[in-house]
Structure formats: C-alpha cells, structure tokens
C-alpha cells in the first residue's frame, strides 16, 4: 500500500484554478480540503492524478461510472456517434430507442422526456406535477438532494411542520414557501403534513434511498406506507432515482423494493457517463408537457446524440451481462468484511449500504438526516486523507456514498479492505 503521496502538481493547479474558477472547482463537492487532486486520466477501477498517483476509485464520478472508467463498449458507442455528428437540434431515432428501453424497466414510466442533468429532471418533474394537479406545494425529505434548483435548496432540520428557509443566498424566502419538509422514515409526520396540506399539495418527492447523505435506507414498510398515503390523498409520488436508477437493479429502487411511484427521475448511469437526465411517468401526466400540453420544458442539449448513444450501450450491456448480480454480491461482501473490521477494532461506527453502495458512518446507524449530522465529520475527513495516501479514493464527505463498479477486481477489494483495516 502507498504510505505517502506527493500532490505538488495538483496544489499548483489548485492555486491557478482559484484565480479563474470560484473555489478552484466546477462543483463544490470536489473542493477537498486543503486542496483537491486534479485528475489526469482514468481507466477501469483506477483514477490517476497530475502527479502520477493512482487510486482505486470508489467515488466513480459520484455514481455514473457503474462499468468503471473508459469502458470499451461505451467508448465505441460514443466513437461511432461522433462519426455521424454530435449535435443536430432535431429528433433522432436514438431517443426513441433509449426511451423504449428505459420505459420497459420502470413500471412508473409510460412516457419520458430527456434533459441534460438530474437537476433539470427534478426541476421539470416538479413543474409538471404542479401543472398537472393545479396545486403549488410539494414535500421533500430532510436531507434529500434533488439538484441545485431554487425550489429544492431548502435547509433540512428546521422542522417538518414549518415552511422551509433557503439553503443558499440568492433564493428569496418567498420562493420556497411552497417547499415543505418531512423527516425520512417518519410516516407519522409525513401523514400529518400530507393531510394538513392536501388541498394545495402537488407531490411528494423522495430519494427512495438517501444517497447524498449516506446511504440511509428506508425502514421496512416505509416506502409502502408512503405510496398508500399519497394514493389515498390524491398526491403524486415522485421517486428521484438519479442515484438508484440502474444502480440497485435494472428497474432501480422501484424494482428492488416493489413500490411504484407516479413519476420517476433518472440521471448518472442512464447516460453511460455523459450528461443526461430523464423524467417520466404516467401517460396522462406526461402528455401535459409542451408541445402536447401547457407545461413548458425545453433544452438545446436535451436528447444529445452522444449521451443517448452511450445510454443505449450502457443499458444493453447491464442487461445482457447480468451486471447487477455481480455488483450486488460484491457489495454484500464489502459490507460484511467492513463490519468485521469495525467490530475487531472495537469502533462505535456503523457500516451501511445496499446493493453496490456502501459507507462507514463515523457514529451510530442513522435513519434520517438529523441522525446523520451527529457523525464525526472531521474524523471522517482525516480518515479520507489516510485512505488516499494508501491508494484508495473515497468520496471526501461523510455524507456521500461509496460505489462499486463492475470492473473492481477481487484484488482491488482486498487491497481496499487492507487499507480500511490499517487506517480506521
């Protein structure tokens, strides 16, 4: 294992980047303290920085790289599309092909629309839910992340029965007055909130598994009770499966748990690692979108040919190679081995995860956002740097999920477990 690494070239690049890019990064999650490493290349399960250090990667671009980096099947699909052109501004057969494939795996989706990001997908889904129901309010889960648009950037922890306050400057408090919050895994509070607001409540949007603060898993029966509650009160249920879609199973969390929402958002994996987002749902809802209906949505890069071509290759490969059986088995092994390490070390930590997602919480097992916040964030950050020095790249935040790819080898996993054992 690597005991020391040099990041001088990355440090110099960071100093230059700060003069040109706010914070030196294009997304805040990449701003590793005291400075991030800058990637030069990636292949398979490995990622290499400017200084030549190589790491086993469990961040995987925060989820999309389910086949690892630079996969030949995805690369060939992109190369073939590049030869035909990469942006037309017209419909393509590729869109129809991928739409048909996605809909075949997701029982909640009769029709869908392609966008360029997960943020666009959830933003458009909420607009559509409001337009379809002619109602204004929606409920999100405390700690649930649905992208960077104004309506969902609301602080968690302010109480499920109070109106949300913006979590960023630049968002008027009046704008988020229709954004309500409920704790995850708390069906009683959710029931009270739904029943109190149902006359003006368009939807409940939820990550079935909270992937951006964990993963934190649903307690047994929680999703089923939520589905029943929304149906009884004529409120739309939206599953944000940007992380779990094609990750837990071909049909995402709704296949894994057997709970079917009214609408679904997808991203990350479905584009094969290229920019994409999807929102879909029941036909009567989706037909409200322009030009068929009066809910407007548009985008120059929506249905980008290269992204859609990569998505077709990704979906076909995942299905034909039965990838999820291998992935989920590796996830089970990783979590069991980590639990044994934690127990042997006598640590008050908790190993959590599902399918090919895993994490060690530096604290007790959390079931909601407030419990996640009790974890030792500084302790985790120090651990992250020790793992990086040992050649293992994990997400730098206690609140982000680790992912396993189809190309992580047995040797990769054993080296990783050795690093955990040495560095916890």
From Swiss-Prot:
Instruction: Read off the CDD domains from this record.
Output: OAT_like
Question: Which residue spans traverse the membrane?
Answer: none
* Localisation: Cytoplasm
Keyword annotations of the record: Cytoplasm, Isomerase, Porphyrin biosynthesis, Pyridoxal phosphate
Give the SUPFAM superfamilies listed for this entry. Answer: PLP-dependent transferases (SSF53383)
* Catalytic activities: (S)-4-amino-5-oxopentanoate = 5-aminolevulinate
Q: Which residues carry this modification: N6-(pyridoxal phosphate)lysine?
A: 268
Pathway-wise, it operates in: Porphyrin-containing compound metabolism; protoporphyrin-IX biosynthesis; 5-aminolevulinate from L-glutamyl-tRNA(Glu): step 2/2
| Statement: the UniProt record of this protein carries the keyword Isomerase | yes
Q: What is its EC number?
A: 5.4.3.8
Gene Ontology cellular component list: cytoplasm
Q: Does the keyword Chloroplast apply?
A: no
Per its record, what are the GO molecular function terms?
Answer: glutamate-1-semialdehyde 2,1-aminomutase activity; pyridoxal phosphate binding; transaminase activity
Q: Where mainly found?
A: cytoplasm
Q: Which cofactor does it need?
A: pyridoxal 5'-phosphate
GO BP, sorted A to Z: protoporphyrinogen IX biosynthetic process
Show the PANTHER family listed in the entry. GLUTAMATE-1-SEMIALDEHYDE 2,1-AMINOMUTASE, GLUTAMATE-1-SEMIALDEHYDE 2,1-AMINOMUTASE 1, CHLOROPLASTIC-RELATED
Q: Which family does it belong to?
A: Belongs to the class-III pyridoxal-phosphate-dependent aminotransferase family. HemL subfamily.
How is this protein named in the record? Glutamate-1-semialdehyde 2,1-aminomutase
The opening ranks of the lineage are: Archaea, Methanobacteriati, Methanobacteriota, Stenosarchaea group, Methanomicrobia
What gene name is listed for this protein? hemL
């Amino acid at each position: 294992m690597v005991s020391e690494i040099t990041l001088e070239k990355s440090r110099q690049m960071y100093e230059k980047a700060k003069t040109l890019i706010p914070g030196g990064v294009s997304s805040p999650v990449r701003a590793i303290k005291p400075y991030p490493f800058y990637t030069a290349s990636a292949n398979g399960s490995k990622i290499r920085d400017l200084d030549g250090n190589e790491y086993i990667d469990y961040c995987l671009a925060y989820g999309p790289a389910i086949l690892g980096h630079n996969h030949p099947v995805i690369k060939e699909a992109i190369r073939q599309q590049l030869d035909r052109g990469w942006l037309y501004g017209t419909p393509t057969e590729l869109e129809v092909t991928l739409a048909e494939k996605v809909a075949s795996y997701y029982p909640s989706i009769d029709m869908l629309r392609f966008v360029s990001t997960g943020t666009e997908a959830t933003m458009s889904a909420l607009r559509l839910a409001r337009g379809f129901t002619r109602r204004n309010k929606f409920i999100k889960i405390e700690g649930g992340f649905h992208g960077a648009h104004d309506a969902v950037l609301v602080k968690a922890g302010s109480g499920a029965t109070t109106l949300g306050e913006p979590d960023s400057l630049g968002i008027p408090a009046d704008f988020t007055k229709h954004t309500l919050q409920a704790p995850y895994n708390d069906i009683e509070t959710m029931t009270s909130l739904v029943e109190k607001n149902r006359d003006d409540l368009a939807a409940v949007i939820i990550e079935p598994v909270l992937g951006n603060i964990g993963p934190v898993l649903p307690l047994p029966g929680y999703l089923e009770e939520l589905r029943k509650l929304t149906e009884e009160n004529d409120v739309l249920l939206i599953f944000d499966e940007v992380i779990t879609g094609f990750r837990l199973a071909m049909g995402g969390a709704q296949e894994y748990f057997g709970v079917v929402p009214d609408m679904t958002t997808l991203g990350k994996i479905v584009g094969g690692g290229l920019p994409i987002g999807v929102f879909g749902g029941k036909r009567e809802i989706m037909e409200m979108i322009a030009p068929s209906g009066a809910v407007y949505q548009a985008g120059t890069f929506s249905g980008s040919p290269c992204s859609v071509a990569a998505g077709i290759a990704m979906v076909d490969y995942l299905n034909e190679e039965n990838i999820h059986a291998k992935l989920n088995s590796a996830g089970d092994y990783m979590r069991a081995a980590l639990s044994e390490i934690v127990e042997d070390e006598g640590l008050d930590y908790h190993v959590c995860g599902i399918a090919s997602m895993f994490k060690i919480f530096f604290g007790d097992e959390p079931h909601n956002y407030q419990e996640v916040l009790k974890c030792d964030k500084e302790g985790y950050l120090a651990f992250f740097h020790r793992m990086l020095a040992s050649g293992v790249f994990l997400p730098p935040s206690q609140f982000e999920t680790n992912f396993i790819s189809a190309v992580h080898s047995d040797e990769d996993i054993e080296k990783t477990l050795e690093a955990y054992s040495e560095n916890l």
